[in-house]
Design a protein with these regions (language model features):
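Glycine/charge-rich catalytic "coupling/switch" loops of P-loop NTPases
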Residues: 147-170
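A sequence-level detector of short linear motifs
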Residues: 107, 141, 152-154
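C-terminal boundary and immediately downstream tail of ABC-type ATPase nucleotide-binding domains
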Residues: 116-140, 167
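ABC ATPase nucleotide-binding domains
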Residues: 1-120
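Beta-strand-connecting loop/turn residues
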Residues: 103, 140-143
Length: 170
């Protein structure tokens, strides 16, 4: 009964209730992807690995699932590894985030901390949608130079004179 209840809840969430008795070859590509996601969510596992689970879903369903998946994960006593290239997905899921570069973790921490205080340019770029505006600046006293433009800027930032790269999110 517990399994039937979980299947029903996940099937409803993923809009699969009408397809529960269909064979795999009778399902569209999107329905097959949702079915694979449903199988992962129904199982009582200690670890769930999800690789781009929302990638090929239509916009409306993807937006609904961005809201609902975190709620499903909260009810589970398991570890969820959610691989995504979508910053919004990572922010919605929350928890901890690892930024990877060529298979190596270059930043790890609470998702909002990684977003708000990226430790490197790669983490900053990965977590920006739309893309972050990147500029090289130099600081001398209270003068900041961006390209050939001098800007006098009083700041509470305690940074040394020198060259920097700044990122501005739109």
């Amino acid at each position: 009964d517990e399994i039937k209840a979980r299947v029903g809840k996940v099937a409803e969430l993923l809009k699969l209730s009408a397809m529960l008795n269909k064979k795999p070859d009778e399902l569209s590509g999107g329905q097959q992807q949702r079915t694979a996601l449903a199988r992962a969510l129904v199982k009582d596992s200690d670890l769930i690995l999800l690789d781009e689970p929302l990638a090929n879903l239509d916009f409306k369903l993807r937006e609904e699932l961005r809201e609902e998946l975190p709620k499903l994960f909260e009810d589970r006593d398991c570890i969820v590894v959610y691989a995504t290239t979508e910053p919004l997905d990572a922010l919605m899921i929350g928890g901890n985030t690892a930024t990877l570069l060529e298979g190596n973790v270059i930043q790890y921490g609470k998702t909002l901390n990684v977003y708000n205080k990226p430790e490197n340019l790669i983490s900053a770029k990965v977590f920006s949608d739309p893309p972050m505006n990147i500029a090289e600046i130099s600081k001398s006293g209270e003068i900041f130079k961006i390209k050939d433009n001098n800007v006098q800027w009083k700041s509470n930032l305690k940074i040394k004179d020198g060259n920097y790269i700044i990122g501005i999110r739109p």
